UniProtKB/Swiss-Prot annotation:
The lineage of its organism: Bacteria, Bacillati, Bacillota, Bacilli, Lactobacillales. HAMAP family: Pro_tRNA_synth_type1. It comes from the Bacteria. It is found in: Cytoplasm. The gene is proS. This is Proline--tRNA ligase. Gene3D superfamilies: Anticodon-binding domain, Bira Bifunctional Protein, Domain 2, YbaK/aminoacyl-tRNA synthetase-associated domain. One of its GO terms (molecular function) is aminoacyl-tRNA deacylase activity. It catalyses: tRNA(Pro) + L-proline + ATP = L-prolyl-tRNA(Pro) + AMP + diphosphate.
Length: 618
């Protein structure tokens, strides 16, 4: 493919509005362009990478018997009313009307559509299991699109749905998908973890997320590639090395999710779902009587603890939420933070929002900073973190502005439902008892759910079982964020390329080091001087030879300065660069391996053989 015939609008500078390196490089290297807020055009390079990823998916899904189809993106609202999600999905749902004033949506996901198709066609357990998937654009009206392809209003997704006559059959397919996802992300060159995830708006029960890890850019050996002009990091002057470190640190870590994982076991979970080892304690201290104390100007836990000279772990944090229009009091040990996902899941609520101060005052009779669980109205629902039940003689708000109560004892002074609703902390014991929890940032690239009968129940999707009884179809759901794969790969494979000029100056610039499986082309074939007939002839021969051996070749035939060509090559990030330069008449070319910066000169006759050796090594 001739580079002069492709739309690859590279930029000389990083885009000023980019906050993460993947967004900056996709724009600068000419992979994507923003059409409007949260909506992107995938230019030829990005489209080729996405198509290669689709090929990987199709190959792995064929192995597990998944069949591809295509459903419409424009959906009637009636389907979503059947499932109940039209009212509960929230403001992210694109809603529109046609000329007949009928309600439609742009699909963010397709559970309802696939359920309807199977409901209308499948009547017996003998027709199951079915394993269907599609790859298409989805739509979500993000309030604040950001970080390039990571948070957009239109995005490409693979969504699959499986249909079963029992849960045992679902378990088999779920495990097939888990293994297929691991194979897909491994082939894509991603560093990832499969973690315990939240079903969220999908309504899933068991679920697993696949997170591409986005580590801090502190390891120079990983993030910096030295040109052959620099022997090692030790040769770089200290002041230049500090500049390089600052440049690496300047780009924020893009992972939108925090992962908690064990240092010594396979346990890993999204922070929203992570838990820790919990051991109830036996109360040995005598219970004090309740005492009301004045705490003027104390609005926060740390202010109250300091004023009363107690540790924050001896205080009770009282929060008020509105869950599906009903008030719920949530209690935590004072130095803990609420995990609203855990609370929402426990309550099985569609909506969960923090109460306003006006709502809190109406419920407790006091404002924020003085709320507590003692002497609440009969029938008040109190959900307390399990650690709260270990407290003895704690401090809590008195439900009276400027006052708190000491000597508060769970069980005696209030009744509650005890469940894990806190956010775990680094260094706590893993829930399996092996190792401690550490945190990492990650980008969600895949998610699998056991939906069960959530949609078949609400939409009447039933089959006749072995005994002739009508039973709901059991479902699974399996998603991959196809377009955000591009961002995840670049986040992990961006590199800072450093070289030394003949004058002794050090220069560095960001570029991409694409893994072979996803690179838009395998080889970047560069002609230094397109006016040199010997170079042109050799380039044409090499291009034909490489393509005959199955290499995808991008040939830079542009009449540009060699410096611009090399800069664009570093930006675009193909695994191999072959340069036809001054020694073209002698049949000598240069091979450069992008991942390491290593380069060698070889006879053009030996190019294919040499590449086969080098690609095996790297």
């Amino acid at each position: 493919m001739k580079q002069s015939k492709l739309l690859i609008p590279t930029l000389r500078e990083m885009p000023s509005d980019a906050q993460v390196i993947s967004h900056a490089l996709m724009v600068r290297a000419g992979y994507v362009r923003q059409v409007s807020a949260g909506i992107y055009a995938y230019l030829p390079l990005a489209n080729r990478t996405i198509e290669k990823f689709k090929t990987i998916m199709r190959e792995e899904f064929e192995k597990i018997g998944a069949v591809e189809m295509l459903a419409p993106a424009l959906l009637t609202a009636d389907l979503w009313r059947e499932s109940g999600r039209y009212e509960t999905y929230g403001e992210d749902l694109y809603k529109l009307k046609n000329r007949d004033n009928s309600d439609f949506i742009l699909g963010p996901t397709h559970e309802e559509t696939f359920t309807t198709l199977v409901r209308d066609a499948v009547k017996s357990y003998k027709q199951l299991p079915l394993n269907l998937y599609q790859i298409q654009s989805k739509y979500r009206d993000e309030k604040r699109p950001r970080n390039g392809l990571l948070r957009t209003r239109e995005f490409i997704m693979k969504d699959g749905y499986s249909f079963h006559h029992n849960y045992e059959d679902l378990d088999v397919t779920y495990e097939d998908y888990r293994q297929a996802y691991e194979a897909i992300f491994t082939r894509a060159g991603l560093d990832f973890k499969g973690i315990i995830g939240d079903g969220g708006a999908m309504g899933g029960k068991d679920s697993q997320e696949f997170m591409a890890i986005t580590p801090a850019r502190t390891d120079l050996d990983r993030w910096v590639v030295l040109d052959k002009s620099i022997a090692s990091m030790d040769d770089i002057p200290k002041e230049v090395l500090e500049e390089i470190k600052a440049e690496l640190a300047a780009w924020m870590i893009s992972g939108e999710d925090t992962i908690a994982y064990s240092t010594e076991s396979s346990y890993a979970a999204n922070l929203e779902m992570a838990t820790n080892e919990y051991k109830p304690s036996s109360k040995v201290a005598a219970e004090d009587a309740l005492a009301e104390v004045e705490t003027p100007h104390c609005k926060t836990i740390d202010e109250v603890a300091a004023f009363l000279s107690v540790d924050e772990t001896q205080t009770i944090k009282t929060l008020l939420f509105v869950a599906d229009n009903e008030p719920v009091v949530a209690l935590l040990v004072g130095n803990d933070h609420i995990n609203t996902v855990k609370l929402k899941n426990y309550l099985a609520a569609d909506f969960l929002e923090p109460a306003s101060e006006e709502e809190a005052r109406a419920f407790f009779g006091a404002g924020f900073g003085s709320l507590g669980p003692v002497n609440l109205a009969q029938g008040s629902r109190i959900v307390a973190d399990r650690k709260v039940q270990n407290l003895t003689n704690a401090v809590a708000g008195a439900n009276k502005d400027g006052f708190h109560v000491t000597g508060v004892n769970p069980g005696r002074d209030f009744q509650a439902e005890y469940v894990d609703i806190r956010e775990v902390k680094e260094g706590e014991m893993s829930p399996d008892g092996h190792g401690v929890l550490q945190f990492a940032r990650g980008i969600e690239v895949g998610h699998i759910f056991k939906l069960g009968t959530r949609y078949s129940d609400s939409m009447g999707a039933k089959i006749l079982d072995e005994n002739g009884r009508a039973v709901p179809i059991v479902m699974g759901c399996y998603g991959i964020g196809v377009s955000r794969i591009l961002s995840a790969v670049i986040e992990q494979h961006a590199r800072l390329f450093v070289n030394k000029t003949p004058k002794g100056d050090y220069r560095y610039a960001w570029g991409i080091n694409f893994p072979k499986e996803l690179a838009p082309f395998d080889v970047h074939l560069i002609t230094v001087n397109v006016k040199d007939q010997a170079a042109q002839d050799l380039t044409a021969k090499l291009e034909a030879d490489l393509m005959a051996k199955g290499y995808d070749v991008l040939t830079d035939d542009r009449n540009e300065r060699v410096g611009s060509k090399f800069s664009d090559s570093d930006l675009i990030g193909l695994p191999i660069r072959v340069t036809v330069g001054k020694k073209a008449a002698e049949g000598i070319v240069e091979i450069k391996i992008k991942a390491t910066g290593d380069s060698i000169e070889v006879n053009a006759e030996n190019l294919i053989e040499t590449l086969e050796i080098l690609t095996k090594e790297h």
